[in-house]
Amino acid sequence: MILSVFFYMFLLHIRRLDCFVAVQDSKTLFKGSTLINDSHGETLVSAGQRFELGFFTPNGSSDERRYLGIWFYNLHPLTVVWVANRESPVLDRSCIFTISKDGNLEVIDSKGRVYWDTGVKPSSVSAERMVKLMDNGNLVLISDGNEANVVWQSFQNPTDTFLPGMRMDENMTLSSWRSFNDPSHGNFTFQMDQEEDKQFIIWKRSMRYWKSGISGKFIGSDEMPYAISYFLSNFTETVTVHNASVPPLFTSLYTNTRFTMSSSGQAQYFRLDGERFWAQIWAEPRDECSVYNACGNFGSCNSKNEEMCKCLPGFRPNFLEKWVKGDFSGGCSRESRICGKDGVVVGDMFLNLSVVEVGSPDSQFDAHNEKECRAECLNNCQCQAYSYEEVDILQSNTKCWIWLEDLNNLKEGYLGSRNVFIRVAVPDIGSHVERGRGRYGEAKTPVVLIIVVTFTSAAILVVLSSTASYVFLQRRKVNKELGSIPRGVHLCDSERHIKELIESGRFKQDDSQGIDVPSFELETILYATSNFSNANKLGQGGFGPVYKGMFPGDQEIAVKRLSRCSGQGLEEFKNEVVLIAKLQHRNLVRLLGYCVAGEEKLLLYEYMPHKSLDFFIFDRKLCQRLDWKMRCNIILGIARGLLYLHQDSRLRIIHRDLKTSNILLDEEMNPKISDFGLARIFGGSETSANTNRVVGTYGYMSPEYALEGLFSFKSDVFSFGVVVIETISGKRNTGFHEPEKSLSLLGHAWDLWKAERGIELLDQALQESCETEGFLKCLNVGLLCVQEDPNDRPTMSNVVFMLGSSEAATLPTPKQPAFVLRRCPSSSKASSSTKPETCSENELTITLEDGR
């Protein structure tokens, strides 16, 4: 026996000597070779030195547990992406990784005990197998030396980490570590949803813990970002965002990224920052309310409240004792039946609840109006709630969603909310309105009562009395709030008039439906902006100041406060509320809500930390931060946003005031078109219109609009061309660039183009990052857009195609642009303080707005 053990150890030693040179700093292990854990630390390293395979002890533990794993090469601390024997650690230092006689990969100890193997079909005598560590981190077992004959691979047997090159399908799961230093299977599993396509789920043991949302479904704030969905699909699937197909991203952007199911229950996406540290880009669930159905059925979650969970009005906890102790999983149930005996419909009502997340509805259909949608729910005793939306106003397409089962996964919040009308029995309404802060964590929430005229006159009197009292108290509260606001300016329209202005006319909306963005209380906005403090002022626009605000949970917003009496200001307010609410695109700024209280008229937008495009490209220092690739992405993003407005949105819209100061930049420098106050809607086959009131910004208006008042989609194309040329040159169109010729930037660009010296227009800050061919392509497109004849200008769909083209030589040759002289010859008597005279006698109303 002793002799046999000695002989076995001798063989291991010989095998180690045979393979040591082949293993250390190698990417391949052949049959009969071994990788031994000892003081030498033998490892397999991928060809490009990106990944390494070897034995490790988790997170520097001092115990004897040894695991075979793969980690990023030469990166500290160790970032392990795959573990072989996660359930069976080797408990001594004598552990060996080898290819067994039957062709399987094995982890064994010095006594030959097997701790892990691949479990694949044994190889034939003639088939030689080898194991190779690829540069993408995939460990592959290959037959006959042919990399196409993959017998087994770690990418199809992951642990807790997903790497570029893997593909998430219905059979793949990511299982978390048990703890920070224990790689055995933990409590959490990430996988594709087996019931709904392209959705993802985190399971906590056998319970659903988190579920992603998909853009285009009814509602879901936990939408999986497009970049991550694309990553998980191995860059093969076409992903849609807001019902629009999104073009593929560059796979090179994912080189140093990983997706991990953590032991804490979070799905996390990381990118290597500067090749040294992992930056967390995305994680879900991000808070307690992001956990699936955190408050149970008919329970609403808001992690910013003192009490995270509350039962909906008219509901009570199923298990009160547990609820009081903070266990909300049991949810809530109705205090009263919603139908009478034998299913007879009685006087039920609906509460309007603004939610940012709710479980999927059970059915949907096209309804002519909200009244029809409400009736569908009311006439069905199983109906718990409904929601209504006008999907396409021009074609009168509407949607009605119905919930027949208990509502779950309810989450309230400020941003991105939708209205869901909860069915409640009449007796429960009065008690809710009167008791203010309820017994089960019900906050003081304004409740909209939709009264159904089937209940008795006595019930009507009770409800109307309660409602009247509530409205009176709310108005007194608002008047008190208005008293604290400085009255430096007085606005000309009443609250009633402006609300009628919002909900009237061109959209033909049902007044009870209103618009698609929430209305906020003035008190909320005053608190968010520190009572419109000057310290929070971002800038002064043509229609009023813009302030930075902070909602609970560090949600940043931008608040535009309408300035003194202005026809343009009121028109802008109406446009931005009722128009932007209907638009959703990644390159359009998002309207989050509005407020009309007394004389105050406020618009709430998503906050853009990097202000506007002009803030960067016209500043000698800041322009260095926008390299050529970033400017190309910005130009393409603006083009896609305009294409959506002109062609792909539910409304066909002309912006009429596109300029660099109206292009806002988010945290990742993605462009967002803003300021739709001057926008116009075109319906049907309408392509152009005329106006006697020319509004816009000097230097960006097309000649036919500035001189004749004629505007069309090609007017926006002209403005886009100016923005393109300004972006690539770093020069303003309204400045003098050739004083002796008195040319605008467009004229200067045209002269350089004709002389085949277009590259001289390049912003000096782009000398190192720009490619000549790419620059000339953008200049070509810009000049095509500013041609004098609108019929010669391309459509935005053609512009997007040309910008995506790889060959500039195939683009059309531009014709002469519309030159605009900046000033007439100065009189010799003019003093230095005299304002320059304009050559045109046309009266122009010009808006000069600072970027937020």
UniProtKB/Swiss-Prot annotation:
Specify one Pfam family.
B_lectin
Q: Residues of the signal sequence? A: 1-19
Q: Which residues form the active site?
A: 657
Give every Protein kinase domain span.
532-819
* Residues modified by glycosylation: 37, 59, 171, 187, 234, 243, 352
In terms of superkingdom, the source organism counts as: Eukaryota
Keyword set includes Zinc-finger: no
What chemistry does it catalyse, as a reaction equation?
L-seryl-[protein] + ATP = O-phospho-L-seryl-[protein] + ADP + H(+); L-threonyl-[protein] + ATP = O-phospho-L-threonyl-[protein] + ADP + H(+)
**Keywords for this protein:** ATP-binding, Cell membrane, Disulfide bond, EGF-like domain, Glycoprotein, Kinase, Lectin, Membrane, Nucleotide-binding, Phosphoprotein, Receptor, Serine/threonine-protein kinase, Signal, Transferase, Transmembrane, Transmembrane helix
Q: Where is this chain's protein located in or outside the cell?
A: Cell membrane
Phosphothreonine: residues carrying this PTM = 691, 847
Which PANTHER family does the record cross-reference, listed alphabetically? Answer: NON-SPECIFIC SERINE_THREONINE PROTEIN KINASE, RECEPTOR-LIKE SERINE/THREONINE-PROTEIN KINASE SD1-8
Q: What is this protein called?
A: G-type lectin S-receptor-like serine/threonine-protein kinase At4g03230
